Every structure is written in structure tokens, then in C-alpha cells.
Amino acid sequence: MISDKIKLTAKDILEKEFKTGMRGYQQEEVDKFLDMIIKDYEVFHKELEQLQQQNARLKRELEEQKLAAAQAPQQTIPTPAAQPVYSNTNTDILKRLSNLEKAVFGSKLYE
């Protein structure tokens, strides 16, 4: 997990003591910067926990969906042989319609 790779916690940063030298850093500036880092770490930690929980939930849902799909009855898929019957029927209907149009309107078309 990623939490194993993180070396510092917000508490570690808060409790860190720096030695000061003769012309060392300004303590207030260091403290303010460390406070910002602590807040960021806390936000990152909360976000990480939420994402891990969401990831676990989504994995559970995926497994449930897989199980449901495996247990659901398989729908039959129409075979390609069934489709030519429909196209033949449509062709027959179109031919009949054409013949009827010729019979009814045929004489008027040529006038």
C-alpha cells in the first residue's frame, strides 16, 4: 500500500525540532511552513483513506455484478439464418406493391 511508502506523518512534522545555529532560520517562518505542510498531509491522508474505501467498494460491486451476470439466464441471440426470412418477406411485399402500383397507376403513368 501507499501508506507503507510514506515516511512522515502530520504528527512527525509537528514534533520535529530543528537546531538553530548562529545565523539560523527564523523560527516563526519555519513553524508557519511546517504548519502548512501538516495541513496538506492531513488532507492527503483523508483523501487517501476515502479513495481506498471507494476502491474497495467498487471492487465489491464489480464482483457482485460479475456473479449476477454469471447467474443470470443467457439470452438467446437470433441466428443469422432467421434474418433472410425477414428480407425475403420484405422483398415479396415490395414486389406485390410494385405490381399493384403498375396495375392501378400503370395506364396513367404512360398518358
From Swiss-Prot:
Q: Which GO terms describe its biological process?
A: cell division; regulation of cell shape
Q: Which residues form a coiled coil?
A: 34-72
UniProtKB keywords: Cell cycle, Cell division, Cell shape, Coiled coil, Cytoplasm
Give a GO cellular-component term.
cytoplasm
Q: What is its main location?
A: cytoplasm
Q: Could you tell me where this protein is found in the cell?
A: Cytoplasm
Q: Which InterPro entries match?
A: Cell_cycle_GpsB, DivIVA_domain, DivIVA_fam
Q: What's the family? A: Belongs to the GpsB family.
> Which HAMAP family does the record match to this protein?
GpsB
Q: How does it assemble?
A: Forms polymers through the coiled coil domains. Interacts with PBP1, MreC and EzrA.
Its annotated function is as follows: Divisome component that associates with the complex late in its assembly, after the Z-ring is formed, and is dependent on DivIC and PBP2B for its recruitment to the divisome. Together with EzrA, is a key component of the system that regulates PBP1 localization during cell cycle progression. Its main role could be the removal of PBP1 from the cell pole after pole maturation is completed. Also contributes to the recruitment of PBP1 to the division complex. Not essential for septum formation.
Quote the PANTHER family the UniProt record gives: CELL CYCLE PROTEIN GPSB, CELL DIVISION PROTEIN DIVIVA
Official protein name in the record: Cell cycle protein GpsB
